[in-house]
Amino acid sequence: MKKWLLIIAGALIISACANKDVYFNGAEGSHSGVKFDKDSRQWGLNQ
């Protein structure tokens, strides 16, 4: 049961991020840190 809850939670997170540019390690709105570009499907570093 716990496995299914984790799978559903992961699917929800992925679907929430699918239509947005995703930034990690940056302040919200600063567009800094590690970014996943959904068009090229590659990770990049923004400063």
UniProtKB/Swiss-Prot annotation:
**Region annotation (Disordered) ranges:** 28-47
Signal peptide region:
1-18
Q: What is the protein name stated in its UniProt record? A: Uncharacterized protein HI_1192
| Keyword vocabulary terms for this entry | Signal
